[in-house]
Design a protein with these regions (language model features):
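P-loop NTPase Walker
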Residues: 1-164, 169, 266, 320, ...
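Conserved helicase/translocase P-loop NTPase motor core
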Residues: 23, 70, 80, 91-97, ...
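Short basic/glycine-enriched coil/helix segment immediately N-terminal to the Walker B
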Residues: 33, 37, 104-109, 256-275, ...
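ATP-hydrolysis module of ASCE/P-loop NTPase motor domains
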Residues: 35, 40, 117, 137-141, ...
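Conserved helicase motor core of SF1/SF2 NTP-dependent helicases
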Residues: 47, 281-360, 364-369, 486-489, ...
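Helicase P-loop NTPase motor core
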Residues: 50-53, 68, 77, 87-103, ...
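Conserved helicase C-terminal RecA-like lobe
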Residues: 217-221, 404, 418-430, 443, ...
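C-terminal accessory regions
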Residues: 633-865, 873-882
Length: 882
């Protein structure tokens, strides 16, 4: 009887626990219920990996390893069985007295550490844990980024490795300032060995866990290598003297701490018995070592990642970490999450087609229960301006159908590709946001105030002191600053300490008054920090230093940016207040400075703003949008020119394409251009091999109207490697493809799906090769008979029957695309006119300025305030008041 009750209860317990995670699919539940030992979760794009992480942590804390177990802490009674049956049937929680019977080896929330790559991901994880576990228990789980976790460890143990607990975190600009000082001391010519190159080499060494001493001991391959090692040692010495870490140091120094101090290592292994790491495919050598050192003897480590999305090799990430995980951690259980909840099946099939060409991968195939959706739209543009117009057309159509600007993202391989899109959107009045532009905290006035705050937090921070000692101007010149630095170095003290006794140094006699005034400012700020709230302290820094007065004076003189800079400082104070509200009693100056040091580009992305988003594919990792435009899909652009010479680099480019494709939820638009200007040079590139890897059944191809017109007139749109002409059609070749000189290749084929063979192609073009026809561009050499309906040279695609019109899309009124077919003449506005904008709504014209045959119109919109736009390009309609 007892045994049967035991079995019945355990079966009911499994059912009860499974119902708590009823929204998960089978593979997700497997991942959640695998609690002990090393676990590798290969999570495909859009497969719900964050959901799995949150639910796995919740299961560890609420039930432990109870699911699938036949163990109970005491003998089962009929009352236990009855109570559990009732809870299952009614969908209610089991009674509290039964809690102990539902758990086995349950984990305390403070014994779990979850590491992510982005602050945004860490924030989402914390929020979802709070919602699932309750505020207090959810907050006790340590969910953090790699760098934030390291800062937390170093704040407690930095003194063990010779640094103060109040250390400063240097950003790229600070590192460059330190390096300039090192170059000056070592008499190194920046033209021979650029500072940027030295910093990059140092970063690689730290990622590889190479110390300055090891770098000096290792024989250099050339003079620059020897210089880099000397610079590395001198740079680290300066950072140690300043009590500062750069961004790479946060992980590098934490690894050194854990490796060299067994007591510290054991403390964290005992504290965090369960370790979960997200985005494991993007970990570096140093991050792998950190994870290994934090993993305790029980090896309760769970890593989540997708080898097909490993795209950060240029930052030191190594895909081998995830590919070799099972070998490094014997006994690993591997679970694949292949069901996608994000995209349509056509988008996923396109992604699968591309990524299957990689060899360095674990292997998985995404699938979905979502609708088939529209085919992937592939557009061939005449040039980058045409590409931008096409994107505006599509967005305009979506807006007419009730869509939102924020539903759209334009993704590109490199930042340089954004300029034509941004320029066109600006002229067309399409609100947009570039992610990865200048960050708020990188603005000069903001960095200056943060530097003042930093020297109050860390008096040894000579780099930040140098930045602001004469900002605003105080008659403290570079010569005086150099003397202060020399005196500090001679005595082994900080520059601030020298300034505090400036009157004791004869060498500083000419600058006594300015230096003493600066010291008085510093003392006032110290007092403010001790006696006032953190946001009040920030306001004091802005005012006591004279910074606010300087900007107010600039504004009075008519300096255009002074008012904006003052607003930025007001926002800085708001940011400090928000930080205090979020952290409560734990708020501190050091904590605030940590937060701003660890902010990434993507953290500034505001999803609630109704704007089209422009960003690199690297920045888009982890995001999703209903409509995605993947531009510049051409050989030499994507994949990049350099990647062609390395199979590993080419596979990384293909993974990047896979990431770009899988950002799309509803519709994906891919474009390539016959000609493109990049870095001041016009390039004529073949369509990307990644396009050709997508099976024809998943794509729909369209072309620029200009290419269609040239096709109908008998002009080719291609070019050859040796014959100039290209877009104008004066080419000696009509296309490319295996055993064919045309795009179309075989009869009825699509040029995108020919196997690329550079040695066999006769030239680049876009010859039409419809059903029953051949591509007959200049010099094609095709002998197949041509059917009626295609007499043009080039500019075609291998479609059945006649070429398809370029677009069925309706552009929004007033957009440049809408006026492309026929000019309607210039628009003219006057002050006082009432206008209607497609996006901004109704407004009144405040000012009009002539500009290159157009007008710059300043309009006060009722909904969004004052905006400037170009009259001939903005979607504006003049309204007659009744």
């Amino acid at each position: 009887m007892a045994a049967s009750l035991q079995q019945e209860f355990c079966a009911l317990r499994d059912t009860y626990i499974e119902k708590q995670f009823g929204r998960l699919n089978d593979m997700q539940r497997q991942a959640v219920f695998t609690t002990d030992g090393p676990l590798l979760i290969l999570a495909g794009a859009g497969s719900g990996k964050t959901t799995v992480l949150v639910n796995r942590i919740a299961n560890l804390i609420r039930f432990g390893s109870a699911h699938g177990s036949s163990w109970t802490p005491r003998e089962v009674t009929e009352e236990d069985v009855k109570a559990l049956k009732t809870a299952i049937m009614t969908g209610t929680d089991a009674p509290a007295w039964l809690d102990g019977m539902l758990r086995q080896n349950a984990v305390r929330s403070w014994n779990v550490m979850a590491i992510t790559f982005a602050n945004k991901a860490a924030g989402e994880l914390k929020e979802r844990l709070r919602n699932m576990l309750g505020g207090e228990e959810g907050d006790e789980v340590f969910a953090s980024t790699f760098h934030s976790a390291c800062v937390r460890i170093l704040r407690r143990w930095a003194e063990s490795i010779g640094y103060p607990r109040s250390f400063t975190i240097y950003d790229t600009d600070d590192s460059q300032r330190v390096m300039k000082a090192v170059y000056k001391e070592l008499s190194i010519d920046d033209k021979f060995f650029p500072i940027k190159s030295a910093i990059n080499q140092m970063s690689r060494w730290k990622d590889q866990l190479v110390s300055p001493e090891e770098a000096l001991r290792t024989p250099a391959r050339d003079t620059k290598g020897a210089i880099a090692a000397k610079v590395y040692a001198a740079y680290e010495k300066k950072l140690r003297e300043a009590g500062a870490f750069d961004f790479d140091d946060l992980i590098y120094q934490t690894v050194q701490l854990l490796a060299e101090h067994e007591d510290v290592r054991e403390f964290y292994q005992n504290k965090y018995r369960y370790l979960l790491v997200d985005e494991y495919q993007d970990t570096s050598v140093a991050q792998f070592r950190l994870v290994s050192l934090l993993t305790g003897p029980e090896k309760n480590i769970c890593v989540v990642g997708d080898d097909d999305q490993s795209i950060y090799r240029f930052r030191g990430a190594t895909i081998e970490n995830i590919l070799n995980f099972e070998r490094i951690f014997p006994g690993t259980k591997t679970i694949r999450l292949e069901q996608n909840y994000r995209s349509t099946s056509n988008i996923l099939n396109a992604a699968n087609c591309v990524i299957q060409h990689n060899t360095e991968r674990k292997g998985k195939t995404l699938w979905t229960r979502n609708d088939e959706g529209d085919k992937v739209q592939v557009y061939t543009a005449e040039n980058e301006q045409d590409e931008a117009m096409h994107i505006a057309d599509v967005i305009g159509e979506h807006l007419k159908e009730g869509g939102h600007l924020a539903d759209h993202a334009v993704l590109y391989r490199m930042n340089a590709q954004s300029a034509p899109i941004e320029s066109y959107f600006t002229r067309a009045g399409i609100p947009h946001k570039i992610v990865g532009g200048q960050r708020f905290n990188d603005r000069k006035e903001v960095k200056d105030i943060h530097s003042y705050m930093s020297i109050v937090a860390n008096a040894r921070d000579d780099v930040r002191l140098r930045r602001i000692i004469n900002e605003p101007a105080r008659k403290i010149g570079n010569t005086t600053v150099d003397v202060i630095a020399d005196l500090a170095a001679q005595q082994g003290i900080s520059m601030l300490e020298v300034i505090s006794h400036a009157d004791a140094y004869a060498k500083l006699s000419r600058a006594i008054m300015p230096l003493l005034k600066f010291w008085q400012i510093y003392e006032k700020l110290q007092e403010s920090l001790e006696t006032r709230t953190l946001d009040e302290f920030a306001q004091d820094v802005i005012e006591v230093t004279g910074y606010k007065a300087m900007l107010e004076a600039d504004a009075a003189k008519g300096h255009e940016d002074a008012a904006d800079r003052l607003q930025n400082l007001g926002q800085l104070v708001n940011n400090v207040k928000n930080y205090c509200d979020q952290h409560g009693e734990d708020a501190s100056l050091e904590g605030y400075l940590e937060d701003i040091a660890l902010i990434s580009d993507i953290d500034s992305y505001n999803e609630s703003a109704d704007q089209v988003v422009l960003m690199t594919i690297h920045s888009a990792k982890g995001l999703e949008f209903p409509y995605v435009f993947l531009i510049g899909m051409e050989e030499g652009v994507f994949p990049s020119e350099m990647s062609k010479y390395s199979e590993a680099d080419l596979e990384e480019e293909r993974r990047l394409a896979y990431v770009g494709i899988t950002r799309a939820k509803k519709e994906l638009y891919i474009s390539n251009s016959v000609s493109r200007m990049l870095y001041g040079r016009t390039q004529r590139n073949e369509p990307s091999r990644f396009l050709r890897e997508i099976e024809p059944e998943y794509i729909e191809e369209t072309r620029s109207p200009a290419l269609e017109r040239r096709s109908s007139m008998g002009w080719g749109s291609g070019y050859s490697d040796t014959v100039p002409g290209g877009a104008s059609g004066y080419s000696g070749a009509s296309g490319w493809g295996r055993n064919s000189s045309s795009f179309g290749g075989r009869t009825g084929g699509s040029y995108l799906n020919r196997e690329y063979n550079a040695s066999e192609r006769g030239g680049f073009g876009s010859g039409y090769a419809g059903r029953g026809s051949s591509a007959s561009g200049f010099g094609s050499g095709s002998s197949a008979p041509r059917a009626s309906g295609s007499s043009g040279f080039g500019a075609g695609y291998g479609r059945p029957a006649a070429p398809k019109p370029a677009s069925k899309l309706v552009s929004f009124p007033g957009s440049p695309a809408a006026s492309r077919p026929a000019s309607t003449g210039p628009k003219h506005y006057e002050v006082g006119d009432i206008v209607e904008h497609k996006v901004f709504g109704r407004g009144r014209v405040l000012a009009v300025k002539a500009a290159a045959g157009d007008q710059i119109v300043e309009i006060n919109f009722e909904k969004v305030g004052v905006k400037k736009t170009m009259a001939n390009f903005a979607p504006l309609t003049k309204i007659t008041e009744e």
